[in-house]
Regions:
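Long, positively charged, glycine-interspersed low-complexity recognition regions
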Residues: 166-223
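Class I S-adenosyl-L-methionine-dependent methyltransferase module
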Residues: 45-137, 141
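Conserved proline-anchored active-site loop of SAM-dependent methyltransferases
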Residues: 14, 28-42, 49-54, 95-98, ...
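Short, conserved active-site loop motifs that form the nucleotide-linked donor/cofactor pocket
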Residues: 133, 149, 209
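Glycine-rich phosphate-binding loop signature in dinucleotide/nucleotide-binding domains
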Residues: 21-24, 144-148
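Mobile active-site "lid"/loop adjacent to the S-adenosyl-L-methionine
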Residues: 104-112, 159-171
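Short, polar loop motifs at secondary-structure junctions
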Residues: 32-37, 120-123, 191-196
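S-adenosyl-L-methionine
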Residues: 1-33, 37-38
């Protein structure tokens, strides 16, 4: 399923790093799970996925419970989808939109490309590996994080297009990270830009699509 902000192209770099850090952990927590490209590839005794996007979490829960998305979505279906139930609204809003931007315009492909079918197949395949994932629709600070967890945070980037209408307070988030780190939690943050006054160790990979990815591996001395 096409999804703005999805990490499908860099998952092969991120997952091994996360998996290595999970060796002595009981739980993997994805606080901003989005389309679940990362958590679906993670192996852990317990997995928690959270996102503030209500319809998106409704979609994941519906598929996990056996709902099968439609194989065909017409332009008229797309126009009516904002009044649909949350799970169908999310499927059409993300999976059938241009570049995966939530209701960013009906996607039209060349030839016989079927965006709905592609999104359906991708989502169902992904959920084959997520039968035991616990899904939540909460603010990141409200999630009950078990001790001995690895917490992965793919936060909204500054000055980029968001898939949610809510603004994101980066300063508050980093303060929360500092508090969680003090409690002994292992927190990794994926971000495009790192503040100059932040003392961190980063994992950096230059991708073929000419973008630097920074994986924060230590949240010490933040702010």
């Amino acid at each position: 399923m096409r999804y703005m902000g999805g990490k499908v192209r860099i998952a092969k770099y991120l997952v091994p790093v996360l998996q290595e850090r999970l060796k002595d952990k009981d739980t993997f927590v994805d606080l901003f799970c989005g389309s679940c490209n990362i958590i679906s590839a993670i192996k852990a005794p317990n997995r928690i996925a959270n996102d503030l996007h209500k319809e998106l979490i409704a979609l994941h829960k519906a598929v996990q419970s056996g709902w099968v998305p439609p194989s065909v979505v017409t332009e008229e279906d797309y126009k009516q989808a904002k009044q649909a139930e949350d799970h169908l609204k999310a499927f059409i809003g993300f999976g059938c939109s241009f570049s995966g931007k939530y209701f960013g315009g009906y996607a039209r492909g060349e030839g016989d490309r079927n965006y709905a079918l592609n999104a359906k197949n991708t989502l169902l395949k992904k959920h084959q590996n997520m039968k035991d994932v616990e899904f939540f629709n909460l603010n990141y600070s409200e999630v009950n994080i078990p001790s001995n967890s690895l917490v992965y945070c793919d936060i909204p980037y500054k000055d980029t297009t968001k898939y949610s209408t809510d603004s994101f307070d980066h300063s508050s988030f980093y303060s929360w990270c500092k508090d969680m780190k003090a409690r002994g939690l292992d927190i990794l943050v994926l971000c495009s830009l790192v503040r100059k006054d932040t003392n961190i160790v980063i994992f950096m990979k230059l991708l073929a699509w000419r973008c630097f990815v920074f994986l924060v591996q230590s949240m010490q001395n933040l702010m």
